[in-house]
Amino acid sequence: MKKQLLSILIICFLTQLIWAKKIIIKMATLAPEGTEWHGLLVDLGQNWKNATNGEIQLRIYPGGVVGDERDMIRKMRIGQIHGAAISNEGMTEINPYFTTFYMPMMYQSYKEVDFVRDKLSEELYSKTEENGFKILTMVDVGWVYWFSTEPLFTPEDLKTHKIFTWAGDYKSTQLYEKHGYQPVPLAMTDVLSAFQTGLVTSIGLNPMYVLAQQLFAIADNMLNMKWGNLTAAIIIDLKTWNKIDSQYQESMMAISKDLGDGFQAKNRYESDMAVGVMEEYGLKVNIPTSDQIDVWHQLIEDMSPDFRGTVINEKAFDRLMVIKKEMESH
């Protein structure tokens, strides 16, 4: 009897040791299940598990079930989740240099996106770590366009619309209001119902997300003009990261980078495919004239002083303007 009891105790002790080594990383994202961004996380989790002999396991919370991106950052800080796959909207809560990606019409080619990101690499990565988080991989998800319930071609047209802005981003809301626009702050998870009820009638968003959320059924007009570039990152809080064995950290970083590079190479051009699919189901792609595009550029030039210190952090804005001049001289 004593031998049996001893055997049971030994088995329980060994089982506890085995499970004690396992680290479960809870990671949230707004991306719905079945999207490419969600698929990247699934692949990431499987590869991490294989590379760490099952000691690191990724538990994914998709579709905004944890809340908006600001909610994700808050919950990471208090330990409810450990990681997130988020856009620059969430990253600006951690690192003000991500506000540089808010500059409208700054980027018109992926060459320009790569140029700016390369020049800002040190600030983007190091400042994030200084604030308690580690970037595992950083990619751009694609171009941002204006989607609306009625056609819009000019800034004056946009003034007739109720514009989605992120809940909590009061600086963008104030900036829009100052220049005569009608911003409506909401959580991204409430966008579909907001369009259905008429609370919102326009949004600047990436076509892949519009397709995934079926927003084009209501916001069935797209202005074919690159308004911005959606940058995203997969991050983990440093407290969790530092619990992981250093040899596994190296493998996990390599896996994250490889998967991120592969995702970007493929999905930089998925936006065009998403637009094509939506066109088959009634999306109207409205092409602005060169004169109309000039009006948009003039708007950005006029608003530029107001971006500094509001939507875009002062130091980040000044750094971006230096990079912009350098980029234009190439």
Positions of the model-derived regions?
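Sec-dependent N-terminal signal peptides
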Residues: 4-14
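Intrinsically disordered, low-complexity segments enriched in glycine/proline and serine/threonine
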Residues: 5-7, 19, 165
